[in-house]
Amino acid sequence: ETMFRQFAEQRRLNAAFSHDLRTPLTLLKGHATMLLSFIPKGLVSQQEILDEISVMSKNISRLEKYVNAMTNLYRLEDIDIPRQQITFHSLIDNFNNTAEALCYDKHFSITTSGNNITLFINLDTVMQIYENLLSNSIRYAKSDIAISVVIENDNLVISVSDDGCGFKNIEIEKATLPFYKSSKDISTEHLGLGLNISKILSERHGGNIQIANNKAGGACVTVKINCNES
């Protein structure tokens, strides 16, 4: 079952990658064809040629980003995730410092529940997941972001909510797919990998990710991560 799931994930990743490469490749082909046709006939000025080259350069940069992202995604499946000891309070300090740095134009609050117990986690992995959730929330929040961190049954549970427009039903189903972008993000530069990476890393750390909407409106993404010693 595990091998079948990994194979299915690999096929989805390859399909998403191929789909996202198609647009910049099509644009490159179109601009190259135009230049090859018009330059010999003297139908374009030097400035128009430079403008076309500039557009082509931007699409080459997009291709490079996708290739690098794809390489990093493949590596996530194989990286070792050793656990270290860290106190709950120390982790919250890390979370608070990160939120203060990232939420410079948004208001955030962090609520916690749990004694200052010792957690057994990979801090780099947990911080990457947290930063992805927070960055995603910042992108859509109108003004407020609510962060909840609790310990439940040997799991570290991190929830990040915002007061934005929330997820559409189809987005709830597809938000963790690689390179997925909502209709609001089509024209943006981000690759649509944050929640997918968070899903992979949380599963590698013995947990999972849940995508939902708050009853009062806005999105809520929750990650559970195993934090016991075994």
Show which residues each predicted segment covers.
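Detector for a conserved hydrophobic position within an alpha-helical segment of the HATPase_c
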Residues: 201-202
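Conserved micro-motifs of the catalytic ATP-binding
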Residues: 77-82, 114, 118-121
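Conserved glycine-rich
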Residues: 143, 206-207
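Short helix-loop "hinge" at the ATP-lid/N-box region of the Bergerat-fold HATPase_c
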Residues: 137-138
